[in-house]
Amino acid sequence: MFNRESYLLRKYRLIVFFLSGYEYFLGFLMISSLVPIIALTASKLLRPKTRGPERRTTYESGVEPIGGAWIQFNIRYYMFALVFVIFDVETVFLYPWAVAFHQLGLLAFIEALIFIAILVVALVYAWRKGALEWS
């Protein structure tokens, strides 16, 4: 016999079966989603309601701003930042490999060498293009 209660019970058991082991993850996901929403809402509700021309000016540590806020940076800053990010990400990828070096074996060692070789080629390319020169 088809019974609505038995159908809902079977559906509930199926949901519980699929979610078993993920309760902590779902709880963490819900809390980590709610905290920024609550913080932004609280800051919007508690902030002072100021209107006026001072609000549109740039803040320079309490000192009266001099000139415009638009400053054009040299492209060299971006090149250094890009090279830094590339090699910073390299260390993030190589650290777990170095920690588990003995368990991974020869194949992982060869893969890491290929990864390092590609990054060395990128460094040599950036060096030859003059991205690392400051002049």
From Swiss-Prot:
<feature type="transmembrane region" description="Helical">
    <location>
        <begin position="79"/>
        <end position="99"/>
    </location>
</feature>
<dbReference type="InterPro" id="IPR023043">
    <property type="entry name" value="NAD(P)H_OxRDtase_bac/plastid"/>
</dbReference>
<feature type="transmembrane region" description="Helical">
    <location>
        <begin position="104"/>
        <end position="124"/>
    </location>
</feature>
<keyword id="KW-0618">Plastoquinone</keyword>
<dbReference type="GO" id="GO:0030964">
    <property type="term" value="C:NADH dehydrogenase complex"/>
</dbReference>
<feature type="transmembrane region" description="Helical">
    <location>
        <begin position="15"/>
        <end position="35"/>
    </location>
</feature>
<keyword id="KW-0813">Transport</keyword>
<comment type="function">
    <text>NDH-1 shuttles electrons from an unknown electron donor, via FMN and iron-sulfur (Fe-S) centers, to quinones in the respiratory and/or the photosynthetic chain. The immediate electron acceptor for the enzyme in this species is believed to be plastoquinone. Couples the redox reaction to proton translocation, and thus conserves the redox energy in a proton gradient. Cyanobacterial NDH-1 also plays a role in inorganic carbon-concentration.</text>
</comment>
<dbReference type="InterPro" id="IPR038430">
    <property type="entry name" value="NDAH_ubi_oxred_su3_sf"/>
</dbReference>
<dbReference type="InterPro" id="IPR000440">
    <property type="entry name" value="NADH_UbQ/plastoQ_OxRdtase_su3"/>
</dbReference>
<dbReference type="GO" id="GO:0048038">
    <property type="term" value="F:quinone binding"/>
</dbReference>
<keyword id="KW-0472">Membrane</keyword>
<dbReference type="GO" id="GO:0008137">
    <property type="term" value="F:NADH dehydrogenase (ubiquinone) activity"/>
</dbReference>
<keyword id="KW-0812">Transmembrane</keyword>
<keyword id="KW-0520">NAD</keyword>
<comment type="similarity">
    <text>Belongs to the complex I subunit 3 family.</text>
</comment>
<keyword id="KW-0521">NADP</keyword>
<dbReference type="GO" id="GO:0031676">
    <property type="term" value="C:plasma membrane-derived thylakoid membrane"/>
</dbReference>
<protein>
    <recommendedName>
        <fullName>NAD(P)H-quinone oxidoreductase subunit 3</fullName>
        <ecNumber>7.1.1.-</ecNumber>
    </recommendedName>
</protein>
<comment type="subunit">
    <text>NDH-1 can be composed of about 15 different subunits; different subcomplexes with different compositions have been identified which probably have different functions.</text>
</comment>
<keyword id="KW-0874">Quinone</keyword>
<dbReference type="GO" id="GO:0019684">
    <property type="term" value="P:photosynthesis, light reaction"/>
</dbReference>
<keyword id="KW-1133">Transmembrane helix</keyword>
<dbReference type="Pfam" id="PF00507">
    <property type="entry name" value="Oxidored_q4"/>
</dbReference>
<keyword id="KW-0793">Thylakoid</keyword>
<keyword id="KW-1278">Translocase</keyword>
